């Protein structure tokens, strides 16, 4: 329900939480269940299936006839209806996991995690909005630790090749345990790695796992340096920078997918953003902080959460959280402004407006979001992150039924290509950073110290209560020779952040990454094409919006 409503979701599959789930009981009877064509109807179908294995043992025989056919208009959310197939595929795969368990067995954390990822995959395929998840798991959970790392693989059959893409049937193992055999398409580089070294990426076999960012829960009072360094080595060798790290003072607390908000179970936060790239004075910054806090406090009065259980309303109203964020930071000299003073202005405005509208003052007010989408609208750097480079490309995903796709394919085919792992297309836009802006080529400790500076000056001064503060959401790009230095910094400064994610500096193993470095000559070439775009020639006589998204928070570009 939350994902279909456009909300990112954080969840825990820590062992002590998953252990509280009931034992799986095989259904002993069946009944017809008609799925209603609504957000609530789709959510109810998941609930009914799970109850069949955990409670009433009455297996639903799903009837999809009420669901609008694929391509029908979605009046409220926009875009086109996906039809019943994404939901049917989701329910079948969840049932396969449940059927694999013996009567009286318990789900493992990884199985619980995969069920949630399958739900997110159905939402994504449904085109309602890109799904964002963060999965928090126990530090000793080896299955979760490795679920987005390389598999051992063997090519069983080579079925064909076209333009450097190989069609192969592959069997894979993890720790000498057979997992599955599947027919896949792989680009030349991954084919060579599989053929020569017997290694293949996880996303060919469990693509739904890309819907979640996974993070190890690290209890600050309990972690030892040796254990931390052991887990850091796994992150380093994963090739994708996963899992991330979530340092906490209380393992019962969690966060939103991009990790800037400290949340109790069953809790929402009210987010606003300040563009600091064009702030002219301290007074200007303070004024913006007040306005953002004013807007967030008004939002905090909206707590009529239909469909959800009463504890969501109770917990959200109790702390009335705000998330006043900053973006465009890499375009300014932060030492010229007093962010602690600005945070205090936000606190005072929240207290004043909360009293006027009859809500509780917020327990936590200031944070820094990734700002992937907001920065595009504003033309700024993203949150705490540097500009990607002096010259780079930004990739945007569109559906092939959208008017912009046909227009670009007919007029400027140089900037559009097919998705490698989807049926959409990718538009490539060139970007040039402003003069004297901070770029991703900066020293990694310079970036980490900027995270620390804003944690201490902005986030900490907006903290009014709770065992964890809010956070500076950050993805750390790490060069090959920097992993040791980053490990040392993280250990020495573990009180200066809650959650961080990591990517190898070369964008890791992600194909068609959201950002990619280019040369000045490439920029000039792409720019010459961009200059020929005339959006007045693009006509939309119906809404074909494709709301499917990218890897959440990838490369400092959270698309929520």
Set out the residue ranges of the language-model regions:
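Function-dense linear segments that define catalytic or interfacial modules
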Residues: 1-87, 234-333, 555, 559
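Flexible, glycine/charged-enriched surface loops at secondary-structure junctions
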Residues: 59-61, 101-114, 123-135, 302-317, ...
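Catalytic or ion-translocation cores adjacent to nucleophile or general acid/base/metal-coordination motifs
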Residues: 62-95, 381-413
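Internal maturation/activation junctions in enzymes
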Residues: 128-166, 199-222, 303-313, 321, ...
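Catalytic alpha/beta core of large soluble enzyme barrels
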Residues: 235-238, 244-308, 318, 370, ...
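Short acidic, low-complexity intrinsically disordered linear motifs used
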Residues: 545-560
